[in-house]
Amino acid sequence: MIAILSNLMNAKRWAHASPSFLQFDLGDPAASGRGACVRAIEEAAAYVARGHRDIITELTGLTFSEVIFTGGAGRGRLWPQIMADVLGVPVHIPAVTESSALGAAICAGAGAGVYSDLLELRPGLRRRTATFEPDQAATAAYDEQYAAWREIYRRMLEITDDGLLNPLWRAAGA
């Protein structure tokens, strides 16, 4: 099953196709039930993350050797593994998963002079509760699925542009 939800950011043309689950099979509840839908959503989010990573690499030349997955998404086991497999790099779950709140507190502490600078706290922030290593066979399969997802999304946008489907969202002027 393939979920079509969010698209990659594109400042020249930012639009999202009509949300869809493709290859949904009413005759096979195991392949199209709740678990399959959740997995398809998590895979679609991982494809968007991969696309954004690729854009950053293309623009800056920087590559990523690891990813840190924070927040509620890091509490499960499936989504971090999907991310590791789609991105092809280890995904780490930090001990403190609420990184936004922690970052704000650290910046406030540095601003108030509690810490000499932000780097002072770096060693304590590297504690991790789990690491998900990419499975090479899964990564190879996801490479093919990602290419298919990109092409399907491109065609879904064409259908949307032709007025056959309503977009999920379209930026003003797009």
Write out the residue ranges for each language-model feature.
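Low-complexity, flexible helical/coil segments
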Residues: 37-41, 103-108, 127-131
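Acidic, glycine/GT-rich loop-and beta-edge segments that sit at the periphery of enzyme/chaperone cores
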Residues: 113-174
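Generic detection of intrinsically disordered/low-complexity segments and helix-coil linkers/edges
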Residues: 8, 18, 41, 73, ...
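Short, hydrophobic alpha-helical segments
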Residues: 53, 108-114
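Activation-segment/catalytic-loop signature of the eukaryotic protein kinase fold
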Residues: 1-102
